[in-house]
């Protein structure tokens, strides 16, 4: 297949099932790759100004945003999933341990074309 044909026919939002670890072992969720605009949206939400007035990345805000955007099943933007909580990232932070959030966010990043090294760099 020609490169141009491959690019034209490519679905960059393909889905993938991942198995969770720890207390959630045995549970499978479906994630999807995020696109460039969604990456920028998640990163913008994670930028905080520190005490020195400098911008920094809040890793938990970034990871919970990536999880809210990149999870297909369950869909954390669906009000039926959220119950009484109205903000997807708040639901995620209330119902998942920090390590679980990081694990899922890293899987979404890897599925979006970032390797392990790029995931670490993106969080800096």
Describe these PLM feature segments.
Residues 1-14:
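Extended acidic low-complexity intrinsically disordered regions
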